[in-house]
């Protein structure tokens, strides 16, 4: 059975990734350079953009986020929730890691590294903001790129689709209280009105619009759906890159003064990626799930819905905040780190199947 999203059941090589996806780290580095240069050359322009707000929501960023996330959410078939029961153990592992381990482990790592061990190397007035950004990054499971990672490992397409649909359904109601709770226990003031507004603007409304668009496109046939997705898919990356240019135009001066900050913020993110992916992979093996289920389960546990994290950080704390910078570090390292995780799970298949009690794929 083929999933409607076009997720291919066959194992794939690097061709499964578009040029934009494959070289995302390069594009992010270019955005850093372009943003810093433009911010230094035309500060009044970016100050004007930063002031284009209504109810603490920056209008240009709001538009860019919609362009960024709606094409991704169109791929999500919430009808796949009916497939959850077919791999209930794998789904259980996914939910456990994504909602009970990942956000809390990131909060702990941020507290250890940012508030304590790295604190002497960081600007004191931004430490809370950095921690908030890391929490936002870990609080939303990956939506779009997990389809790519799953294809690269020969993951079960229906399981991948069902876990994304379930995670996105949970995210609609759980993102705000989870972020609010973790920020609260981290002694960071929670702007609840802005947080709830962000959830409505960047999760609820895009999900509704995306599903209406999905239904309309599928009514015209699968070929129309696939052709439209191929056309609008690059919009997401373009909107992300423009957002990053804006962000680094505001952050440029701080980065030039303390370039080490990006490397320090990457440390807890890297630890979290490898810890959560390894935990999910091992748990799936322990409960006897197939390798084709364990791979996407481990990968969604390792990656983040960084587009939402960037949007929420800007709305809650502003362009100039350490929170916004912390979420962008997640974007910067996403592709190379996830490709390494893909390599590990692909090359450990023999070890996995020797220990799994369920029949292998």
Regions flagged by a language model, labelled:
Residues 1-75, 79-302, 306-361:
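Alpha-helical transmembrane segments of multi-pass small-molecule/ion transporters
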